Amino acid sequence: MARDYYEILGVARDADKEEIKQAYRRLARKYHPDVNKEPGAEERFKEINRAYEVLSEPETRARYDRFGPEGVSGAGVGFQDMSDMGGFADIFESIFSGFAGGGMGGPTQQRRRGGPARGDDLRLDLKLDFREAVFGGEKEIRISHLETCETCSGSGAKPGTRPRTCSTCSGSGQVRRVTRTPFGSFTQVSTCPTCNGTGMVIEDKCDTCDGKGTNQVTKKLKITIPAGVDNGTRLRIKDEGDAGQRGGPPGDLYVYLFVNEDEEFQRDGINVISEIKVSYLQAILGCRLEVNTVDGPVELIIPAGTQPNTVMKLENRGVPRLGNPVSRGDHLLTVLIDIPTKVIPEERELLEKLAKIKGDRTGKGGLEGFLGNLFK
């Protein structure tokens, strides 16, 4: 028993025309044979098309609602009616305008049968060291992509010959079969089996590319990494994707950047973050220290009385702003105070004198206060 057309599209029986169209778009995209290679997808796609043919037209829908499948048996929308219904032609153009993608990249522009087709975009993931991401620079990468065959100039035909127009479809890439019924004519359009939709037939294939018009080539490229890139930054390398078909333009290469962690530095936006350890005496008395930055060693002044976890700022020592490298973030250093667990006798004696001067109470458990742990 044939499935209910409303059930096939997943809509209610009182669904309006727009709801039916949206359901068809969603299902056609999911089950189109060029996208879904699972067993049964093609039959499901035909089933979806048939349901939409009937339910998208008020006349055939009314007959279906009244008489069921028998009322529309063999009926359909003729090819000449597509411009009036505003359905299949527009829907297929919008649904599949992004298909024909693939490779490492995402979708590319729509391929037109028999005409030039843009090559696929490609994706490459590239890891950078922390400082490479901060300052940028030139980087050499290796890619593998399709290039137009130099022997046949992309035609796929042996030099001295040329592809001929397909006699089966007259170069359209499609074949149509018209079925006439008491309810009207039904036109079924499918890909030409002779030329596989290209509209051309190659009788003498190029020996270099075996008729494909392209060859897989591995090559090295030098690319420029801008200063200030971060995880997920995407660089577009124009025309370094796969070669186009039948004279179409090549796709692009998209390089996605990922930054390795650094042992010393971290990053928060355009600020660099690190830690610095000082002794308790340096924290109390203050000092000058040499600290590491992404630019190299610089002098940092630790003020007297610096407290644990104080954040010191080195202005303009951070990451250049992407697209405006003159503007830079800051380097933020968290001060960690190193308090020893044991001290030598001479140091202990001096600290006990200091504790008495400060009025800190001493005892068996050690000093209470800032220096307490030193006397355990």
Swiss-Prot record:
CXXCXGXG motif repeats, residue ranges: 149-156, 166-173, 192-199, 206-213
Note on how the cofactor is bound: Binds 2 Zn(2+) ions per monomer.
Matching SMART domains: DnaJ
Keyword Endoplasmic reticulum: no
UniProt protein name: Chaperone protein DnaJ
Localisation: Cytoplasm
Record Pfam families: DnaJ (PF00226), DnaJ_C (PF01556), DnaJ_CXXCXGXG (PF00684)
Family: Belongs to the DnaJ family.
Source organism: Nostoc sp. (strain PCC 7120 / SAG 25.82 / UTEX 2576)
GO cellular component: cytoplasm
